[in-house]
C-alpha cells in the first residue's frame, strides 16, 4: 500500500489577521479511502502508471478532446505533491520560484515549476461550500489581479466579498470576473457545474477543468483564502512541469499517461499505444530543440541598415475601469526622403527593432501620464496577413525589395500591431509591408557590414542551416573530397547532400540529424536496431555488419569475435522470436538469417495471403449518375453590389476592374462549358422521336428507319392483334337461330366412333344398329338416342314380349343388341376417363413443380428489383444534389445581401439617409468590400465546380466508350462487379448509366502464393506466375492449382505457367515520421478555415429579417420520390419473404389421386360364328384331301384317264405328256 504523508504547511498571511494560518495534520485512518486518488511521486517526478487520474484534465487553449489518444506536452512531471485531507479556513501563497519542497509525498524535483494544479481527488459529487473565496494572481510589475465568482450578475463596478470559487458541485450558475482593487476588469464566463481541478501556469494562464478561462501577464505567485466546510474532502496541490507524454482521454478526463522519456517509450508514443507487441518498429525522429544556426553565404561587400520602429500606445479606462487601447496610438518609422510614412531598405542587410512606449489619459485623448497598474501595456506586432512573422525578419530572411508603410496603398500584406495588457491583446493599428521575393536583401540579427564572408559553420553536431539559400536541419561534416565544379550538391529528390566553401574549396557533407532505423522490441524492451549508418543509437553499443545494413544490439558480439565483423562469421545458435523477411532476432538480441529453403525437400512460398474468389454470381443492374454540364450563370456585378445607387456606383469604380474580372470569369467559364458540351453531345431527331413512348409504338415513326427490317416496336406492338386468339373462318359453327331451335348435347366420345357413326347413318334412325361401330374389336353405339330411336327400340321390345309365346321373341333382338352396344360404349368411356385421369394428375403435379420454380424465379427477380430500386434511389439522390447545388450557391450569394459586413445597415439607401456623405461612404465601402468578397467566393466556387464537371464530363466520355460501346475489363469501373453491358440515358444536367454486372454470391477462400521458392543444388531461385490474372494456391492434396481471380475455376498448374526470377528475398521499404509529410501532405480544410474566420466575425453582424421571395431558382425536390422508392424497395423485400412462404405452401399441395380400377374383360365370339367356322372346315378338308390324293401321275384319276385313253385312242397314247402335280391352297 502506498505510504501517504500530509505535511505541516505554514504560509504567510497576505490578508492580515483576518485568516489564521493553514494547519494540516498527518493523514491517519480517515485517509484510507483516498489512497486510490493520491499517489506517491516516483523518482524523476513521474506519476505511477496505476494511478487513477481522477479529476485530472488535459490543459488546452482551444477545443477539448472528448476521448482518444494523443501525444502532447502537458504539466505531468511532478516536482512536489502535497495531499491535503480537508479544507481549513486559511490563506495560502504558492510561488513558482523559490517554493519550499522540503516535505512532499514521494520524490522531489528541483525543476522549474510551470503549472500549479489544485485537484479535488474525490470520485463522488462533493457539495460546494468548500473552496477559495478568491484567487489572487501576482503578475509581473507588482499588479495583483483577483478572480472570483458570484451566484448572480453584478450591475455595478464594486464587488462585495461574498464571491467564491467552490470546489465540487455548485448550486446554480456562478458568474466569474477578473477584479482589480475591487473593480471588474473583465467578465470571464460561467463557472462549470462541478469544479474538479484548477491549474495556473507561470505564463499567466488560468485553467478550470482543463479549459483556459483567462490569460494575463506572467505570474510570480498565487494567493487564495479558503472557506470553512463541514464535510471531509480530499485535495492535492501539485507543482508540475511540462513534459511530452502519450495521454489517453475518456470523457475529457485523463485515464492513462505514458511518458515519452525513453527510447522504448518514444516508440510507444509514435505508435500511440502503451503496450508494444514483439516486432520491428520504426524509430521516431527525435525533436531538434534549440540548436546552433549555421549560415553559408558567398563573400561580398555588404551594407547594413538598422530600422527602428517606435510604437506609442495610448491607454484609457472604460466606465468600469477596464484598460482600453486607443486607436490613436501612433507608429513612427525612420525618416527617408523627408517622408515618415514609407521606409524602404536600400542596403544589402537590415535589422528591425521595435521600441514601445505607453502613455495614459483620463477621459480625453491627451496621453501624457505614464501607464501604471492595469493600464500598463506593451506593443506587440503579430503576423497578420504576411507569409512571415515579424520576429523572424532578422533570422536571415531574404528579399529583393522590402518596405514598411503606414498606408495600405501598394502593400502586399500587413502586420497587426496590438497593445498587450494584463487581460488581453487589443488591436490598435496596422503596419503594411511592400516586398518582393529574392536574395538581394537579407535580414540579419546584427551589423556585419563591410567585406566579409558571413558564413558560420557548426560542424559535427545537429545544426539549423541556411546554405546558399537552402534551409534545413542536419549535421555538417568536413570531407576529403575534391570537386572542381559546383557550389552545392543535391540528390535526385532535391535533398542537400553537400556544398563547397568557395573561399578554401573544402567540400562539406550534410547528413540528417536522425537516420531511419528499425528497432527490434521483445517483451517490451529494445534488443536491437537496424540502421543504414555506422553510428550508435538507442544506447546500443554492440554492432555487426550485414550486406545491406548495420545491426546494433544488446548481444555482445565481441565475446568470441572481433567487434563489427560480418554476421556470416558470427553465427549464433538461437531461436528467433521475431522475423522480418529472411531476418530473425532472438530474445538475447542476436541477429540470425533465416534461409527460406531450409526445409525437408518441400517448396516454400515467397509470401502468402488469403484471398476470396467468387464461385457463383447473380446479375444486377446498377444505376450511376454523372454530371456533364452546369447551367451557365451571369451576374450584374454593379447591380448586385450597389442595387442601382449612383453614389455606390461611383465608389465601386475605385475598385478598378473588380466587377469586370468577376463578370468575365463567369462569361468565359460559361462559353468554355458550352463549347465542350457542344463538342461532346449532338441531338438526333430520330433519337428524339424514339425517346417518346407513343412514337416508339408507332410503326410510322420506325418505317423510315428500319425499311429492311420488321418494324421494331411499331410492327410488333401493333401486330399483337394478329397473334391473339380469333375466329377461324375455316371452321363451321351453328348460327344463333340454330342454337335456339335445337337442343345441344355434349358428350365424351371414343376416337372417331361418333363421326363414323353419323357418316354411316346419314341421318336415318333405322340405320342405327346397321351402322354400329367397333372400338378395339368391341361393338359400340353412341350413348345418346333421340326420340325416334327410343320409339323404334321400344316397339321392338314390346313386340318381342307380345310375340314371345308364339315364337316371335326374335323381334326384340335389335333392342338387346343396341343396349349391349351402348353399354360397351359406356364401359370403354370409363377406361378412357381413367387414363385421362392419370394423365391429368401427372400433368397437374408437373405444373405444380413448374409453378414452384416460377415463383422461385419471381422471388429472385423481385429481390433483384428491390436492389435495383435502391441503386436508382441513390442515383436520384445524386441527381437531386447536382441540380440543387447551383441553386443553393445562388441562394447563399443572395443571402449575403442581408449581411451588413460590420456596417450599420445592409441597405445602401438607408446608410446615406442616416449619415453624412463622408461617413456613409466609409460604411458603404464595407458593404462593397464584403459583397465583392462574396461574389469572388461565388465565382471561385463556380469555376471550381466547372472544373469538377469538366473532369466528370471526361469520365462520362470514358464510360460511354468503355461501358456502353464495349465491355470493360476494369473491375468496378462500369458498376460494382464484372461488367456485361451498359445502357446510357439522359438525365438532368448529366447522363445516367444502367450497368448490368455480375455480382458474386458465394466465395471460396484460398491461401494465395505470390511465388514458389525452390532449390537447385546450391542455387536458390523463385518461380512466379506468368499471367498476373491468375492466382496460385496449394490445395489439401499438396498439388498446386491456378484459378482466375474473377471466378473460382481451379486447374492444375504446369511449368509453362511460371517464369523464373533470381531469388526469393522480399524487399520491405520503410519510412520514418519525418518523411511522412513528403509522402502524405498535410490536409488543410479550406472550407473549415473560412468558416472559422466567419464565425469569429459573426457576433458583430446585424442580420435583418428579410424574406427571400425575390430569389427565384428552380429547386429539384426528389426527396419524396426517393423516399417512395426506398419504401417500395423495402416492400419488395418483404414480398420476397412472403413469396418464400407461399412457395413452401405450394410444395405441400402436390396431388396424389386415387386411381380407378381397370377391369379387362375378354368377350367370346357368338355361337353362329363358331357354327360358320365348323361348316367351313367340314367343306374345305375333304376338298383338300381330294385335290392332294387324286391328282398327279399316281393318282387314281390319272390312272383311270390313262386307261380310258389307251383303249380308245392309240395315237393319243403316243403323244402323251405327263401331268404336273398341282397344289391347291
From Swiss-Prot:
Places the protein is found: Virion membrane; Host endoplasmic reticulum-Golgi intermediate compartment membrane
Q: From which residue to which does any coiled coil extend? A: 880-924, 1114-1156
Q: Name one GO cellular component term.
A: viral envelope
Q: Where is this region: S1?
A: 13-552, 17-552
- Where is the motif named KxHxx mapped on this chain? 1221-1225
The reply on keyword Hydrolase is no
Q: Where is the signal peptide?
A: 1-12
Per the record, which residues fall in region Interaction with host ANPEP? 433-577
- Transmembrane ranges, per UniProt, are 1167-1186
Region entry Fusion peptide: which residue ranges? 798-819
Topological relation to the membrane, as annotated:
Single-pass type I membrane protein
Q: Provide the residue span(s) of the region labelled Heptad repeat 1 (HR1).
A: 813-932
Query: What task does this protein carry out?
Result: S1 region attaches the virion to the cell membrane by interacting with host ANPEP/aminopeptidase N, initiating the infection. Binding to the receptor probably induces conformational changes in the S glycoprotein unmasking the fusion peptide of S2 region and activating membranes fusion. S2 region belongs to the class I viral fusion protein. Under the current model, the protein has at least 3 conformational states: pre-fusion native state, pre-hairpin intermediate state, and post-fusion hairpin state.
Q: What's the entry's take on its domains?
A: The KxHxx motif seems to function as an ER retrieval signal.
Q: Which family does it belong to?
A: Belongs to the alphacoronaviruses spike protein family.
Annotated protein name in UniProt: Spike glycoprotein
What is the organism field in this record? Answer: Porcine respiratory coronavirus (strain 86/137004 / isolate British)
Q: What lineage, starting at the top, does this entry show?
A: Viruses, Riboviria, Orthornavirae, Pisuviricota, Pisoniviricetes
